[in-house]
Amino acid sequence: MMQISSNGITRLKREEGERLKAYSDSRGIPTIGVGHTGKVDGNSVASGMTITAEKSSELLKEDLQWVEDAISSLVRVPLNQNQYDALCSLIFNIGKSAFAGSTVLRQLNLKNYQAAADAFLLWKKAGKDPDILLPRRRRERALFLS
């Protein structure tokens, strides 16, 4: 089974941001590392909590398990490592159910790799900003096509 590469992890950290000190996310949820909201060594994320970069990477690998499971269960065509890494970044951001109903997945499973790549650009809206994620999607699309 494929897994995200170290290059994919580095890119995902750059896209999502990594914070080694706990903070409240845009919805007020205590968060640490790369968007981690679960427990850290059995403790809930709380104000003042800090972690090492190594712990952040460990948490991210655990948090990516559902993403990798989504790819394994939904994608029915061969992928190269860059395509896999780009999909990990997209799915980590939009969620499994959104990906499951996406044009990206539909085109991919038809072996229309170019159309699948172009469909990344449809996932550009967040909150009230219709284009805020477009630069990220362009980078993911470029990785997918490389």
UniProtKB/Swiss-Prot annotation:
Molecular function terms, GO-annotated: lysozyme activity
A cellular component term, taken from the record's GO annotations: host cell cytoplasm
Cellular compartment(s): Host cytoplasm
Keywords: Antimicrobial, Bacteriolytic enzyme, Cytolysis, Glycosidase, Host cell lysis by virus, Host cytoplasm, Hydrolase, Viral release from host cell
Broadest EC class assigned to this enzyme: hydrolase
Active site per UniProt: 16 (proton donor/acceptor), 25 (proton donor/acceptor)
Enzyme Commission code: 3.2.1.17
Keyword Signal: no
Catalytic reaction equation(s): Hydrolysis of (1->4)-beta-linkages between N-acetylmuramic acid and N-acetyl-D-glucosamine residues in a peptidoglycan and between N-acetyl-D-glucosamine residues in chitodextrins
Family: Belongs to the glycosyl hydrolase 24 family.
Matches recorded under PANTHER family: LYSOZYME RRRD-RELATED, PTHR38107
Protein name: Endolysin
The organism of origin for this protein: Salmonella phage P22 (Bacteriophage P22)
